[in-house]
Every structure is written in C-alpha cells, then in structure tokens.
C-alpha cells in the first residue's frame, strides 16, 4: 500500500506545473484518499533540505483553484544532484556528502513511498539518477515523472506539458509588441523566444502568431497593413543563418514595408556568440547543468547589433516573451494532456511502475510509462516539417539548411 506520496517541480517554469499538481491531487483523492500527499518546496533543493508541506484535506477539497494560476505553488529551483561542487558551494550539502544519498535518506526519513517529479529533461534525468541510486541501495521507492518543458525537447516524448500554452502566450505577447512596428520610422523589432537548443517554441509561437494574423481584418488604406505586422525572419538553433544574405533581404523589406520583425529562438546563433566572447577573453556564464546562461549573453541584442546598421534601422527594440509565456496558466489543449498524463502517473505509481509518463514517439505516440533509461534531452526541432518550410516560404525566407 502506498502511504505517502511526494510531489516535486523543478527546472524552469512551464504553463503546466500548477495544473499538474492539481490533477495529481485530484487523482489520488479519487483512487487512494488515505494516501498522504506532500510537496517538496523549491524542487530538489527542498528535498535536500527536508523542506516540504503537506496537502491538507482543505487543499485536497479545493485543488481546482490551482488551475487558475501559472507558476508552481510549491516553487522550483535548478539543482543537479550529481553536481556535487555546485551543491557544496550553495550550502545544500556538506563537503564529502553524496547528494544522492542525502536525497534518498530524506525520502526515507519522510516515509515517502512514491516521488512524482514534474520537470524537463534535466529534472527527469536527475530523477533517473536518484531512481538508479535507490535501486542499487534497495530503497523501496517508486519514482514517476511527468514531462514538463516549453522547449518540447525531451526524447522520446512527442509533446511535453506546457509547450502548447507557452506558444499561445508567446503569440499573444507578439501581437502587442509588434504593434510597436511604426512607433518610429524604420523600426527593427526582435522577438526573442525561449529555446536553448531547440527551435520548437519559436516555430510554434510563430505559427500561432501567423494564424492570429490570418484571422484579422486589415485596412491598408488607413495604414493598417498586414505587412507591417508580419514576421519577416525566423531563426532557430537547428538551421544555419547566412547573416550577409539575410541582411540584404531584410534591407529590402525595410525599404518596402518601413519596418522589420524578427522572431528568434534564444539559442539561435549562440555558438557564434560564445566563440566571439571566448575570442575576446570574456567568461561565458553557465548554470549548474553546464548550460550557457542565455539571459546573460543576450542573443536578441546580438542579432540587433548584427542587423541594425546593415538594414538601415532607425530604431531597434528587443523584447523577450520567455518569462511571460512560461508563467501562464495552462490552456485547454494542455489541460487535456495534463489530465491524461497525471492519471496515468498516479495509476503507475500505485502499481509500483517507475518511469516518465509521455507520448512515446517510438510507440506511435501512445501515452505510456517510459523507462528512465530512454529519457534524454536536446531533441532537435524538425526543420523539414511541411508547415515550417511553408511558413518560411510565406515570409520570404529561404528554405532552411541544417546547422552543423
């Protein structure tokens, strides 16, 4: 019998965390009301520190209130249990301690039978490390993860929770920001969208923004011209960017339309930026997982610098939709997937089946409990998809060429 279940949200926010917690509470209350539910605060940091809260009967009775909010009610952090040096530096473990053992011992001390991790590839691969450690040391714990990331880059999962909503919100953000295209003559607007190594979110945001444009009624005779609101360039990490050719093409757009709007993944062009920083002796900032801290190197500003003078921009503006998009409440499309995923996660946990619940691309996208050993990150966006190549053709951008 499962007596106690712990929930944990980790990594960056996505528009699914609060809703996923709500669905897990709902399902456990339906099928195992006697099971105690707790949440570790601030992800793996809370687990290491033994910082948790219990979901009381009052919480379980009003779980539906969580659907109205984004973020995570129990908080997140970026902690990698196998990065001992970072954990010691942050005071989360003592020098000489094994963080996996500290986490495992805390779970046992708290009497936890099941741990649900809600996170992206880093969170779930960290959960896999913990699960492997527990198995080696005969700890009786079942770990069942739920896949969360707005990058939608978890292998082998078709659709991660929150990514659809993030794209919707990014398109909504763009609808307001792009209205600035004629706030000054010859304006260059760069919409920077989250996506470290994967262009999915930038592409899907662009697709949904263009769908919004298609649904509008225009009045060019009064200056309300779709051309000024359109996307003129879309750059993702998976495709090469010919800066010279693009500058020439966008100069023509600027001359004809009077403004230029560029949508980019924050990871687009990063190898060039990093190489440039290293060549000039600058330190490249990284996080606990070894990722380049993109918010500190500002890819959008870099692209603005590359293009502004060459296309004759009178004013340049860089706007980032990332935090706006990732902190939204779940939309209807995501809510349906979250409910199905949480239901299967609870059922798997009660049956003692570990893994990550997701649409398995290697099994016809069937929602399944996927073995932790098969979970990996950095799944690239497929730049050969028909809708994507058609989108680029529509905005006048050459067909994509895969980056090396």
Curated annotation (Swiss-Prot):
Keywords: Cytoplasm, Glycolysis, Kinase, Magnesium, Metal-binding, Transferase
GO molecular function per UniProt: 6-phosphofructokinase activity; diphosphate-fructose-6-phosphate 1-phosphotransferase activity; metal ion binding
Active site, UniProt feature: 151
Binding site for Mg(2+): 121
Binding locations of substrate: 149-151, 194-196, 266, 323-326
pH curve summary: Optimum pH is 7.5 for the forward reaction and 7.0-7.4 for the reverse reaction.
Enzyme class, spelled out: transferase
Site (Important for catalytic activity): 148
Cofactor field: Mg(2+)
Binding positions (diphosphate): 12
One cellular component term from this protein's GO annotations in UniProt: cytoplasm
EC annotation from Swiss-Prot or TrEMBL: 2.7.1.90
Pathway the protein acts in: Carbohydrate degradation; glycolysis; D-glyceraldehyde 3-phosphate and glycerone phosphate from D-glucose: step 3/4
Marked site positions, Important for catalytic activity and substrate specificity: 122
Gene Ontology process terms (BP): fructose 6-phosphate metabolic process
Subcellular location: Cytoplasm
One Pfam family in the UniProt entry: PFK
PANTHER family, A to Z: ATP-DEPENDENT 6-PHOSPHOFRUCTOKINASE 1
Subunit structure: Homodimer.
Official protein name in the record: Pyrophosphate--fructose 6-phosphate 1-phosphotransferase
Source species: Propionibacterium freudenreichii subsp. shermanii (strain ATCC 9614 / DSM 4902 / CIP 103027 / NCIMB 8099 / CIRM-BIA1)
Gene name tied to this protein: pfp
């Amino acid at each position: 019998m499962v007596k106690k279940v712990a929930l944990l949200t980790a990594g960056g926010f996505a528009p699914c965390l609060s809703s996923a917690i709500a669905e897990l509470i709902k399902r456990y209350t339906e099928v195992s009301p006697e099971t105690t539910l707790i949440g570790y605060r601030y992800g793996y940091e809370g687990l290491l520190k033994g910082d948790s809260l219990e979901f009381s009967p009052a919480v379980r009775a009003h779980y539906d209130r969580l659907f109205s909010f984004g973020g995570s009610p129990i908080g997140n952090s970026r902690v990698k249990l196998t990065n001992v040096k970072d954990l010691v530096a942050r005071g989360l473990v003592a020098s000489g301690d094994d963080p996996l053992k500290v986490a495992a011992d805390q779970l046992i001390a708290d009497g936890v039978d099941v741990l649900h991790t809600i996170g992206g590839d880093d969170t779930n691969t960290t959960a896999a490390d913990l699960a492997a450690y527990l198995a080696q040391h005969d700890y009786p714990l079942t770990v069942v993860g739920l896949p969360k990331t707005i990058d939608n880059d978890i292998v082998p999962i078709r659709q991660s929770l929150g990514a659809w909503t993030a794209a919707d919100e990014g398109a909504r953000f763009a609808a307001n920001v792009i209205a600035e295209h004629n706030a000054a003559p010859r304006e260059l607007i760069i919409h920077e969208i989250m996506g470290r190594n994967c262009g999915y979110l930038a592409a899907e945001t662009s697709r949904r923004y263009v769908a919004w444009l298609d649904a509008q009624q225009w009045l060019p005779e009064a200056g309300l011209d779709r051309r000024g609101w359109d996307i003129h360039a879309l750059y993702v990490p998976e495709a090469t960017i010919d800066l010279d050719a693009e500058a020439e093409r966008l100069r023509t757009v600027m001359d004809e339309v009077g403004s230029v709007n560029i949508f980019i993944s924050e990871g687009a062009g990063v190898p060039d930026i990093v190489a440039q920083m290293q060549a000039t002796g600058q330190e490249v900032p990284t996080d606990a997982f070894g990722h380049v801290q993109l918010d500190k190197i500002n890819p959008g500003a870099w692209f603005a610098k590359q293009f502004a003078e060459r296309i004759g921009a009178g004013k340049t503006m860089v706007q980032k939709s990332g935090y706006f998009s990732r902190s939204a409440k779940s939309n209807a499309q995501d809510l349906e997937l979250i409910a199905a995923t949480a239901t299967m996660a609870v059922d798997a946990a009660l049956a003692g089946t570990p893994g990550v619940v997701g649409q398995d691309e290697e099994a016809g996208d069937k929602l399944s409990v996927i073995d932790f050993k098969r979970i990996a990150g950095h799944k690239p966006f497929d730049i050969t998809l028909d809708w994507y190549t058609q989108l680029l053709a529509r905005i006048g951008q050459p067909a994509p060429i895969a980056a090396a």
